[in-house]
Each structure stands twice: as structure tokens, then as C-alpha cells.
């Protein structure tokens, strides 16, 4: 049973305030403690509810259940912060149907009734741990839920780099970049670049090239226990970046080495009891409809 609820909103998004208001009143009626996230709900008028608003690190130490109001981007941001705290997380989608924030405002209250009655499913999802090093010194240490992307910057030129899997040379390529995706991220940027859809329960990572120079360069699926190393060539200096979930960016140079492994912890995603990932795929991708 959950007793301390953390609510996260969309940055500067007053469009989420109506739902946050409903959530606060709902949980207070259920005699639950409600705390808002300072980073995403800084302007929300908490005074009328008599509740706290805490900085994210402090908030994570206080709550046992997280509700994210927004879209998949908002969910990704919170998921990266919550992964070390073993806190279940539920996403309420404000706009279009989401792969991560998959509860609609119309069914939100029914879903929460089920959750508080312990009638729900909880699914563990993997994340990626990213280290960028130069001469043994760590320059960038972050987490990604969907994907880690090596991408050229504004230059029209391709970038060149080598990829290794568990210290074994995989390939050298010229392309616009490389996507390393979790099973969750296989339906994001990776999918639009021609990558496979991977069941979210699999322990795997996919490597998908972005506009490769040679058509023989195909997506590769490797074990989730593998270590991926990206070693850029000289022409990458100042012309390419590593991007986590489309939100965290680090510009790389020729001597930078990027290591990607599975994060040791998991995200615990809360779903309604009748949640069906394949039904969600059909709805998002228009499968089974007449063309």
C-alpha cells in the first residue's frame, strides 16, 4: 500500500495544473501524504492544499509512489532521477497516447482506485548507464531510459567511428550517428531509423545506425549484459554529440571513449491490471486497420 505520493508535472506547463489539482484532492481524500516536485511544479499554488514542495533529491527520499503528469518526455526525465530509489512510477498522459505515460486523464481515477487496492501490474524496465572518458578521466556520467545517441551536429558531413561489443571489434562506419536503445527505446528514435521493435521484457540492447554510408550496415541486437564502446575518429572533434533520451547532451572529441552498459537498477512502471503492451503498439502504429 502506498502512503506518500510524489507528483511530477510538465515543466512550466500550467496545462497540467487541472489534473494535478484533481490528484491532490483525490489522494488527500484517501488520507495520503502528497508532495510536489519543486523542479516541475515550482509555480503551482500549493498553499491552498497545505502540502509540501521539495527539491527532487529530497523528494525521492520521502515518497513511496510517483505519479507523472505529462507526456513521454516528462516521464523520461523523472525516470532517470528515480531509478536509484526503487519507487514505482505511473504516467498520466496529457496529450496523445504515450508508450510510457499510458494512462489517460479519463481513466486516471479508476486506475488509481485499482492501484491503491493493490490491483495493478508492475513491470520492470531496463535503463542504460553512460560513461564518457578521456585518458581514464570520467567526463560524463549519466543514465538513459530510451536511448543513447551518437549524432553529428550541424555539419552536413558524416562522422566516422568504431564500435566494440565486449571488447570485440564490431565495425567501423561513416554515418550520421548511432542509436543504442533499450527495449523500451526500441519504439522511439530507433524505430524511426529502421530498428526492430523489441519486447520490453527482454534483456537486450539494439544498435541502429543513422543514415549509414553503406547499405550493408544493419541493426544489431546484443545482450543487455554487454558493454558497448564507441570510439570516434579524428573528424568527430567538435562535430558530434552524445545525447541521452534527447534531453542530456555532451559534445565529444576524437579522444573521447563512450561506454554504454545496462544500469544495475530498474524502473518499476505501474500499469492498470488489463495493460497490454501489444494493444498499445497496435493503437500507436495503426496495426490491423485498413490501408
Curated annotation (Swiss-Prot):
Top enzyme category: transferase
Primary site of residence: cytoplasm
Subcellular location: Cytoplasm
MF GO annotations: ATP binding; metal ion binding; NAD binding; NAD+ kinase activity
Keyword NADP on entry: yes
Cofactors that this protein relies on: a divalent metal cation
Enzyme Commission (EC) number: 2.7.1.23
GO CC list: cytoplasm
Catalytic activity as recorded in UniProt: NAD(+) + ATP = ADP + NADP(+) + H(+)
Transmembrane residue ranges: none
Binding locations of NAD(+): 72-73, 146-147, 157, 174, 176, 187-192, 247
Active site positions: 72 (proton acceptor)
HAMAP family the record matches: NAD_kinase
Function of the molecule: Involved in the regulation of the intracellular balance of NAD and NADP, and is a key enzyme in the biosynthesis of NADP. Catalyzes specifically the phosphorylation on 2'-hydroxyl of the adenosine moiety of NAD to yield NADP.
Name of this chain's protein: NAD kinase
Species this protein is from: Hydrogenovibrio crunogenus (strain DSM 25203 / XCL-2)
Name of the gene: nadK
Amino acid at each position: 500500500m502506498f502512503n506518500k505520493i510524489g507528483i511530477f508535472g510538465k515543466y512550466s506547463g500550467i496545462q497540467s495544473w487541472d489534473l494535478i489539482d484533481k490528484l491532490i484532492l483525490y489522494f488527500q481524500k484517501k488520507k495520503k501524504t502528497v508532495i510536489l516536485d519543486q523542479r516541475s511544479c515550482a509555480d503551482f499554488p500549493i498553499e491552498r492544499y497545505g502540502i509540501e514542495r521539495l527539491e527532487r533529491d529530497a523528494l525521492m527520499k520521502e515518497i513511496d509512489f510517483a505519479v507523472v503528469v505529462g507526456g513521454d518526455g516528462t516521464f523520461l526525465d523523472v525516470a532517470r532521477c528515480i531509478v536509484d530509489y526503487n519507487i514505482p512510477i505511473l504516467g498520466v498522459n496529457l496529450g496523445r497516447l504515450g508508450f510510457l505515460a499510458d494512462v489517460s486523464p479519463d481513466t486516471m481515477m479508476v486506475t488509481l482506485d485499482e492501484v491503491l487496492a493493490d490491483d495493478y501490474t508492475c513491470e520492470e524496465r531496463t535503463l542504460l548507464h553512460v560513461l564518457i572518458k578521456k585518458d581514464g578521466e570520467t567526463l560524463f556520467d549519466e543514465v538513459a531510459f530510451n536511448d543513447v545517441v551518437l549524432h553529428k551536429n550541424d555539419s552536413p558531413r558524416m562522422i566516422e567511428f568504431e564500435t566494440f561489443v565486449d571488447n570485440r571489434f564490431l565495425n567501423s562506419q561513416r554515418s550520421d550517428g548511432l542509436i543504442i536503445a533499450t527495449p523500451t527505446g526500441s519504439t522511439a528514435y530507433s524505430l524511426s531509423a529502421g530498428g526492430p521493435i523489441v519486447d520490453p521484457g527482454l534483456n537486450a540492447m539494439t544498435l541502429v545506425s543513422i543514415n549509414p554510408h553503406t547499405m550493408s550496415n544493419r541493426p544489431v541486437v546484443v545482450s543487455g549484459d554487454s558493454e558497448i564502446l564507441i570510439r570516434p575518429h579524428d573528424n568527430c572533434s567538435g562535430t558530434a554529440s552524445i545525447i541521452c533520451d534527447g534531453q542530456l547532451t555532451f559534445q565529444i572529441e576524437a579522444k573521447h571513449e563512450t561506454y554504454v552498459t545496462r544500469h544495475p537498477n530498474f524502473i518499476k512502471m505501474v500499469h492498470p491490471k488489463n495493460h497490454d503492451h501489444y494493444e498499445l503498439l497496435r493503437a500507436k502504429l495503426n496495426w490491423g486497420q485498413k490501408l
